């Protein structure tokens, strides 16, 4: 497979801190054309959970807790799905707890999901849109919604038309 130099695709969503699933599409039409034998390989994904300004998020007082999660999929979703769903490219969950009596930066754990994403040979994409979805629970300081941002390191590669179409059909 011939491939390009690596480049970066960025996206973000702002869940409402009420546990409501939100989703945004990421247009890959400039990179992916299965009939033209062009596919995208995602090599790495870096994810940030922050407030809308990129600052560290705080949890509310009184020993509150919270969670924020994301998923990157090849198909549109109406809610969070498990990693067993064939549309899932990547996902992650962060759990947090504030044990103080004032709004503070929380103790964090990400032991329940595969954040960060590590692949030996990357993840091939042959669809022209992928979807970043996520949600955040109550407990985060209400002044700012959580922001889930991701940066993907990618290359464009060529495949045979038959292989690219088969991959595209498997991801729809």
PLM features: what roles do these ranges have?
Residues 37-47, 121-142:
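Noncatalytic modules at the cell exterior or secretory-pathway interfaces
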Residues 24-78, 85, 149-153:
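Beta-rich globular "head" domains
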Residues 1-31, 104-113, 119-125:
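Low-complexity, Ser/Thr/Pro-rich intrinsically disordered segments found in N-terminal tails, propeptides
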